[in-house]
Amino acid sequence: MKNLCWVFLSLFWFGVFLIIRFAEGQNQEGFISLDCGLPLNEPPYIESETGIQFSSDENFIQSGKTGRIPKNLESENLKQYATLRYFPDGIRNCYDLRVEEGRNYLIRATFFYGNFDGLNVSPEFDMHIGPNKWTTIDLQIVPDGTVKEIIHIPRSNSLQICLVKTGATIPMISALELRPLANDTYIAKSGSLKYYFRMYLSNATVLLRYPKDVYDRSWVPYIQPEWNQISTTSNVSNKNHYDPPQVALKMAATPTNLDAALTMVWRLENPDDQIYLYMHFSEIQVLKANDTREFDIILNGETINTRGVTPKYLEIMTWLTTNPRQCNGGICRMQLTKTQKSTLPPLLNAFEVYSVLQLPQSQTNEIEVVAIKNIRTTYGLSRISWQGDPCVPKQFLWDGLNCNITDISAPPRIISLNLSSSGLSGTIVSNFQNLAHLESLDLSNNSLSGIVPEFLATMKSLLVINLSGNKLSGAIPQALRDREREGLKLNVLGNKELCLSSTCIDKPKKKVAVKVVAPVASIAAIVVVILLFVFKKKMSSRNKPEPWIKTKKKRFTYSEVMEMTKNLQRPLGEGGFGVVYHGDLNGSEQVAVKLLSQTSAQGYKEFKAEVELLLRVHHINLVNLVGYCDEQDHFALIYEYMSNGDLHQHLSGKHGGSVLNWGTRLQIAIEAALGLEYLHTGCKPAMVHRDVKSTNILLDEEFKAKIADFGLSRSFQVGGDQSQVSTVVAGTLGYLDPEYYLTSELSEKSDVYSFGILLLEIITNQRVIDQTRENPNIAEWVTFVIKKGDTSQIVDPKLHGNYDTHSVWRALEVAMSCANPSSVKRPNMSQVIINLKECLASENTRISRNNQNMDSGHSSDQLNVTVTFDTDVKPKAR
């Protein structure tokens, strides 16, 4: 039986490996590799040269047709160039890519015409990134194809790459690739960085790409006749932020004439271009005792380094220009010249040059872009012009839209939307209200049904609303009638089921009918009231839970939600439920408003589950529900505002600020454990959270931790034969209990497993799943490292050894016991809390001892938070 269990667990982790491998593509998180024109029904494939997984572009673009180069050319080119996508319809056709806002990306687009259409006319067209022009593609000049690269930081979570028709020929594209880079590399003062060249100095003929370059940059070999190539067989430490290929750093060039400069000259496409230089140096020769290699960097006669450059032996050094440079007349002359004290000539291993691409036009307001895209998706709108940025450039304004474009540096706003006669059906969705500057809305002559939503009255900029010719019903909201009296033009004619009068009671046809119907109706009403009273009394005597909406918690109207969020002005984040917005409650309390998206993957069921749970649980380490909104098709949860975000942001550095020290991390872990303990033993019935992870641990202004996101939580009976319940497996990969995954049997020990993974994340600051490791799962990786005896790799290096060793290793033992594959061998949360408090006591003792020996002026770059806890380990209600 034991062997069978291990077989199942092995299959589980193998399945996890396959899922991650498929999703990330050749072990590279964040890589997007699109083979343009590859049919959607063809599976992803591994490209033989690089080992990178390519897949179809079908899900990233709404338009275009697919083509294929002739068979005789396919064998001569990489597989991803065999197919292509071309765009005979429309002027601008755009890829829409999901990216991480503020992350540095290398974006590569490849174009190979190959006479796929038999016309033998190479196309010429423009390529845009967002609303700005990137470059012109002229395949008449480069018939063998071309590759364009740019390093760019997206301003939102959505990135558009657009192909723009500029003449008679038809735009096309062969491949589109995105590669995330380190955020502290390739920083431009403004704009983005267009690839000019990237070379390693060698007489080799091999183009270097992934996997030799972890970021999949392409390095071209280059050498001049007046240079000597030198090389080494020793490994060079290439681990700086730029991380150039090991192969490139093992080679270098020096001038043949030992007293000469190492000189490179190149001409810019545009004489006015500004450039950034990146040079990678490593000393790969063993120098004699009296030898010195030191040199200056001179660009067009100006020394641009502040002191002599001396490469270190077998270590990388990257020198770069922090400010953009210009070359007179567009001709750049760079020289490395040895200094007077140098006995050896200059040396260069690898070299990169980029030109600055200014992106002056701001993209349309992000909230409005999300809203109009959701409207497009909800109603299934298919318009060739509805691609790329909705408002800019002006010549590509979406059909039916008008925008306020006052200044290219300010985000445009949508002020008019005409969807008349567009075949719309369903209700008027709430996404319209996020168009906060909308002045005119025309939804006439469609098949819209349901009520006229009250949120239209809260859209203060609206001057004209045309809802005529639909199938709307019910009454017109009084607030909208009030706006009408203030000057709003409202047209609702042609909606047969819509009540236009103030009372919404049909006029009687005959007075005699009133005399008969009125008494009968009165008697019927009295009978109904009596029956309802008796029914309610009977129901109240039964031992059943109350309806979930009956609560002392505040129930807000949707208009109140809009008021507290200032019309959804400040998004805090986004999850499976929808967008979370910042709110202000009566000017006295900050709140977080979690709004259910119309296209939410969780939906109303999880919304209801979360409300039901939060209405009956009260604990200082569970996020506090201030109120909720359940109004027609509008659902929202209003929580207390947690000003320091989530734990994952602090561990990853995305939140900024100081590093969380070890004591603070233990504090957070204990508080999260207390919240779980309350769910497991303090609730009746007991609850399992099912989604314990670092993004669901929120931190207030004092870094006190609270557990959030209860949409997946489930109740269970403690003790007896029903201590486990069978459910559909849910949770987050990496944190998910493998035993629960295999059996679908849920218990509180599933949360314990997830907490163990969370604790490992806190200790190591490693990804929970990382395919670049030999053991991708964090628990397996820690076990592997411990067995190797190389324990220095385990603890987060950002702590710089500033912790009590016993405390850390005791916490590690707790984490590993929680993450035991067998649920019966895992501790309960009360035992976990006792052990973690012992860890905290050890750390506090170390701090007290150190404080006695430290000068009062000592400072630390780590964040210190005062830690205090009750000695009672039982859950305490607030």
Curated annotation (Swiss-Prot):
The chain crosses the membrane at residues 515-535. Glycans are attached at residues 183, 203, 235, 290, 404, 418, 445, 466. The modification Phosphothreonine is found at residues 557, 727, 732. Residues 849-878 are annotated as: Disordered. Residues 1-25 form the signal peptide. Disruption phenotype: Endosperm development arrested. It catalyses: L-seryl-[protein] + ATP = O-phospho-L-seryl-[protein] + ADP + H(+); L-threonyl-[protein] + ATP = O-phospho-L-threonyl-[protein] + ADP + H(+). Residues 26-514 are extracellular. ATP binds at residues 572-580, 594. It is found in: Membrane. GO terms for cellular component: membrane. The active site is at 691 (proton acceptor). Its EC number is 2.7.11.1. SUPFAM superfamilies: L domain-like (SSF52058), Protein kinase-like (PK-like) (SSF56112). One of its GO terms (molecular function) is protein serine kinase activity. Its main location: membrane. The keyword Oxidoreductase does not apply. LRR repeats lie at residues 413-436, 437-458, 461-483. Residues 536-878 are cytoplasmic. It is a single-pass type I membrane protein. The modification Phosphotyrosine is found at residues 639, 740. InterPro entries: Kinase-like_dom_sf, Leu-rich_rpt, LRR_dom_sf, Malectin-like_Carb-bd_dom, Prot_kinase_dom, Protein_kinase_ATP_BS, Ser-Thr/Tyr_kinase_cat_dom, Ser/Thr_kinase_AS. Belongs to the protein kinase superfamily. Ser/Thr protein kinase family. This is Probable LRR receptor-like serine/threonine-protein kinase MEE39. The lineage of its organism: Eukaryota, Viridiplantae, Streptophyta, Embryophyta, Tracheophyta.
